[in-house]
Amino acid sequence: MALKIRLARAGSKKRPYYHIVVADVRAPRDGRFIEQIGSWNPMLPKDSERVKLNEERIKHWLANGALPTDRVLRFLDQAGLAKRPARSNPKKAEPGKKAQERLAAARQAEEEAKAAAEAAAAAPAEAPAEEAAS
């Protein structure tokens, strides 16, 4: 039996309230569950009463192989009960070909400008030394 720690919606229309429950993955979202281990009231401002967790029971179910859903994993991560893996930046977020070409051209122009500035700074420093020698 595969178990999930997930949200079960309660509350009235446009006034959501969620129970954090341990349920079989095949059970309906708001239906049969094994145990209620917390609650989440998104209507409250961000404070300690917004998310309530029974830490002892959550640790028990995590040790027994229950997998939290994404939203519940966020709550557990904030409470320090589970570690949420860092998401890698997908390839889609990388700049396109033209943008990369523009970046490379900008870097090259910046390096050339820096080299020219260094050469200009070095040339006047050498000139007075030659005048002083003559």
UniProtKB/Swiss-Prot annotation:
Biased composition regions of type Low complexity, renumbered to the chain = 116-134
The entry lists its GO molecular-function terms as:
structural constituent of ribosome
Coiled coil start-end: none
Ranges annotated as biased composition (Basic and acidic residues): 91-101
According to its UniProt entry, one GO biological process term is:
translation
Q: Which InterPro entries match?
A: Ribosomal_bS16, Ribosomal_bS16_dom_sf
GO CC, sorted alphabetically, is: cytoplasm; small ribosomal subunit
Database matches in Gene3D superfamilies: 3.30.1320.10
State the residue spans of region: Disordered: 81-134
Pfam families from the UniProt entry: Ribosomal_S16
Which keywords appear in this protein's UniProt record, sorted alphabetically?
Ribonucleoprotein, Ribosomal protein
Task: Check the record and name the NCBIfam families matching this protein.
Answer: S16
* Family of the protein in this entry: Belongs to the bacterial ribosomal protein bS16 family.
Q: What is this protein called?
A: Small ribosomal subunit protein bS16
User: What is the protein's species of origin?
Assistant: Chelativorans sp. (strain BNC1)
